[in-house]
Swiss-Prot record:
The keyword Magnesium applies. Binds 1 Mg(2+) ion per subunit. The basic functional RuBisCO is composed of a large chain homodimer in a 'head-to-tail' conformation. In form I RuBisCO this homodimer is arranged in a barrel-like tetramer with the small subunits forming a tetrameric 'cap' on each end of the 'barrel'. CDD domains: RuBisCO_large_I (cd08212). Gene3D superfamilies: Ribulose bisphosphate carboxylase, large subunit, C-terminal domain, RuBisCO large subunit, N-terminal domain. This is Ribulose bisphosphate carboxylase large chain. The active site is at 180 (proton acceptor), 298 (proton acceptor). RuBisCO catalyzes two reactions: the carboxylation of D-ribulose 1,5-bisphosphate, the primary event in carbon dioxide fixation, as well as the oxidative fragmentation of the pentose substrate. Both reactions occur simultaneously and in competition at the same active site. Mg(2+) binds at residues 206, 208-209. Coiled coil: none annotated. It comes from Xanthobacter autotrophicus (strain ATCC BAA-1158 / Py2). It comes from the Bacteria.
Length: 488
């Protein structure tokens, strides 16, 4: 869509910098002929202009307000390399099937950003434009981060390959569970849950997002009892085990204190919540790199701005930022569980975490090729309302580089926690064996599980309890280029 001549950039310097108010496109924030440079940061926004606001002018406003513009002409622009520093909206297209919405592509010169700082990147890209009155709504759908910029970040402290080597576990997804109930248990009872899950065959057990240091269980007690459980389970099974010790706290000083204690106890992994903020995430990532500890990221709070299709930030962008910031594990959705997630869209999140180069794929919501410049890969985590009866779907959708976390699907087992873990481990090993034998696990999966359940009572009980449980609701965040998929 080209700019109307009436709002094209004013080339005459006297008119362009005369005191007063100009349209953003007139100030140069729209350039339909611009060809992005390899070093540009590119952003794709979904915008819904107010009635009567031209889509091109709205796109130019987004470019302006996320770079150098203000509401009026300022002569101090002439003291800068304004033409270079000015972000440029260079393409606008209607969103398929969404009247009144437009995709707009914006290019930013690399010099606008501080190296290695997600806080600075987000302050520009999302810092101001989402409250801008000429827009009814605005959503950041995707970004292309140039190699020159990616190389300024350290990325995951461990990565998938090294994690598997440390754990000595290959060729299958990792298994986990979140301790339930998430709040209220004493330290000793909490540790017993951890032990039972690990003894039954899980690789990890996990603190939930809101278990920190409350009156019913001080964080130090939790760490001590959990690591006692980990060590006991390791000794009895001969496998490396772990528990995601949540070190989220009110200050960085306290987070470091908890991380140091976790390391002293021999933990291979610590956990933080997304809500601690970008600077805290990058800081604790650096600590994990220096101390050879895995960093598990719980995406607590993301749904407040990622779920609605018209306004906010797509989770694929959050996943890109977190890979730069440096996390080893990231909750990325299940598609078949209780939480929001269209299957193809969720696969796009996984691609962002695990690929060396993420290719454009509109059906999965990916609008740009992204070269990760050798950054280590993030292990995606599927968690939330999944059970053993869905094992074939999960492996078919996500492959083997994933942590499958069955919280209620382990701890809610009718024969106890250890039986729940056994059911999940047997279902996993059975499905991986079937896959390796060349069977069609997507279609034969239920039959394969039923056959395995004949000789595994815990799996049979799990299938009897949850085999018919599904969460088939229409997703709110889906690709605009395909209908909502179903995995039922």
């Amino acid at each position: 869509m080209g700019a109307d001549a009436a709002i094209g950039q004013i080339k005459d310097a006297k008119k362009r910098y005369a005191a007063g108010v100009l349209k953003y496109a007139q100030m140069g924030y729209w350039d339909g002929d611009y060809q992005p440079k390899d070093t540009d940061v590119l952003a794709l926004f979904r915008i819904t202009p107010q009635d009567g606001v031209d889509a091109v002018e709205a796109a130019a406003a987004v470019a302006g307000e996320s770079s150098t513009a203000t509401w009026t002409v300022v002569w101090t622009d002439r003291l800068t390399a304004a033409d270079m520093y000015r972000a440029k909206a260079y393409k606008v297209e209607p969103v398929p099937g969404q009247p009144g919405q437009y995709f707009c592509w914006v290019a930013y010169d690399l010099d606008l950003f501080e190296e290695g700082s997600i806080a600075n990147l987000t302050a520009s890209i999302i810092g101001n434009v989402f409250s801008f009155k000429p827009l009814k709504a605005c959503r950041l759908e995707d970004m292309r981060l140039p190699v020159a910029y990616v190389k300024t970040f350290r990325g995951p402290p461990t990565g998938i390959v090294v994690e598997r080597e440390r754990l000595d576990k290959f060729g299958r997804p990792l298994l986990g569970a979140t301790t339930k109930p998430k709040l209220g248990l004493s330290g000793k009872n909490y540790g017993r849950v951890v032990y039972e899950g690990l003894k039954g065959g899980l690789d990890f057990v996990k603190d939930d997002e809101n278990i920190n240091s409350q009156p019913f269980m001080h964080w130090r007690d939790r760490f001590l009892y959990c690591m006692e459980a980990v060590n006991k389970a390791q000794a009895e099974t001969g496998e490396v085990k772990g528990h995601y010790l949540n070190i989220t706290a009110g200050t960085m000083e306290e987070m470091y204190r908890r991380a140091e204690f976790a390391k002293e106890l021999g933990s291979v992994v610590v956990m933080v919540d997304l809500i601690v903020g970008w600077t805290a995430i990058q800081s604790i990532s650096n600590w994990c790199r220096e101390n050879d500890v895995l960093l598990h990221m719980h995406r607590a709070g993301h749904g407040t701005y990622t779920r609605q299709k018209g306004h906010g930030i797509s989770f694929r962008v959050i996943a890109k930022w977190l890979r730069l910031a440096g996390v080893d594990h990231l909750h990325t959705g299940t598609a078949v569980g209780k939480l929001e997630g269209d299957p193809m869209t969720v696969q796009g999140y996984y691609n962002v975490c695990r690929e060396t180069v993420t290719k454009t794929d509109y059906t999965r919501g990916i609008f740009f090729d992204q070269d990760w410049a050798g950054l280590r890969k993030v292990m995606p985590v599927a968690s939330g309302g999944i059970h053993a009866g869905q094992m074939h779907q999960l492996i078919d959708l996500f492959g083997e580089d994933v942590v499958l976390q069955f919280g209620g699907g382990t701890i809610g087992h009718p024969d106890g926690i250890q039986a729940g873990a056994i059911a999940n481990r047997v279902a996993l090993e059975t499905m991986i064996l079937a896959r390796n034998e060349g069977r069609d696990i997507k279609n034969e999966g239920p039959e394969i599980l039923i056959e395995a359940a004949k000789w595994c009572r815990p799996l049979r009980a799990a299938l009897d309890t949850w085999g018919e449980v599904t969460f088939n609701y229409a997703s709110t965040d889906t690709s605009d280029f395909v209908p909502t998929a179903s995995v039922a």
